[in-house]
Design a protein with these regions (language model features):
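Beta-lactam-recognizing serine transpeptidase/beta-lactamase-like catalytic domain environment
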Residues: 1-2, 8-245, 288-292
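Ligand-site clamp/hinge motif
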Residues: 246-250
């Protein structure tokens, strides 16, 4: 997930009392730990940041600091609370590689440096786009984790009845303080403001959008590459929709943010005429004798 995971680290750090809104960390571009140098390449000059700043600029050093103090065990607990790495009931594909190191003796033991990488969404973190969208949805709605549904309802061909209706199922409630949620939401708001990692994409957008960019470091078949991710929700003050886009090999998440903007244009009928906006597609069954 890359840096789209940083909201989990922020929430865990705030709720566990490791940081507060008044905790500031100075980033010089590098972080020394255990004889290793961990880098932050997300801003050009040294900065002193709090948690909202760290989300806005996607500062690795801030989250390295939180990850070192938090430890992987506590971070994994919060990861599970948000449903990351657990089956959604709809998604196909890999889930969180729980206990992978213990199951495979060929994999080295977890090291302290892995806590740092996990805190910024690297290391063994591996989640589906649906899991990521669902976890951000739980943040913006106040802590309710839902089981995703693919189809809300299907109407009969003459609109007289519903042939199928799926009600949202609550998977769990996540206890997050209002203060923690407000700090994280503010950070996601500033991501799309001027100077934020997606600020240039949403600078003139008519609806306020919250979001988070991410760059997931991948290594497959002897080659390394970066996936770009962007998660967004809108409108900021009354969220209706959460979108997660992954661009394989796209690099930085800002490079896929325009795709999310296009999807929001479509959802909110931005830039369309009133007549076009009124023609909303519905899940309607078609009578067999209408098919040619």
């Amino acid at each position: 997930p890359g840096s789209t995971f940083k909201m989990v680290t922020a929430i865990a750090g705030l709720e566990e009392g490791i940081i507060s809104g008044d905790t500031y960390v100075t980033c010089t571009g590098t972080y020394e730990y255990g004889g290793q140098t961990f880098r932050c390449n997300n801003h050009d000059t040294p900065m002193t940041l709090n948690v909202t700043d760290a989300l806005k600029y996607s500062c690795n050093t801030f989250f390295y600091t939180v990850g070192q103090k938090l430890t992987g065990e506590h971070l994994e607990q919060w990861t599970k609370k948000f449903g990351l790495g657990t089956a959604t009931g709809q998604a196909a594909g890999p889930t969180y590689r729980e206990q992978q190191r213990k199951a495979d003796p060929a994999i080295r033991e977890w090291q302290g440096g892995d806590d740092l990488n996990a805190a910024i969404g690297q290391s063994d973190n591996g989640f589906t786009p649906l899991q990521l969208a669902n976890y951000v949805s739980a943040i913006v709605n106040g802590g309710t984790l839902y089981k995703p549904t693919l189809v809300k309802s299907i109407k009969s061909y003459d609109y007289s009845s519903f042939m199928k209706t799926d009600e949202s199922e609550v998977r769990g409630k996540i206890d997050i303080s209002d203060a923690t949620r407000e700090l994280v939401m503010q950070g996601m708001s500033e991501v799309t403001d001027e100077g934020g990692t997606a600020g240039s994409v949403f600078a003139d957008y008519p609806i306020k959008v919250g979001g988070k960019t991410g760059t997931a470091e991948m290594f497959e078949n002897g080659e390394s590459f970066d996936n770009g991710l962007f998660i967004a929700f809108a409108p900021f003050d009354n969220p209706q929709i959460v979108i997660c886009v992954v661009g394989e090999g796209a690099g930085h998440g800002a490079y896929v943010a325009p795709i999310v903007r296009d999807m929001l244009d479509e959802y909110f009928s931005i830039g369309k005429s009133d007549s076009a906006a009124s023609r909303q597609a519905e899940n309607t069954l078609i009578r067999k004798n209408n098919c040619k």
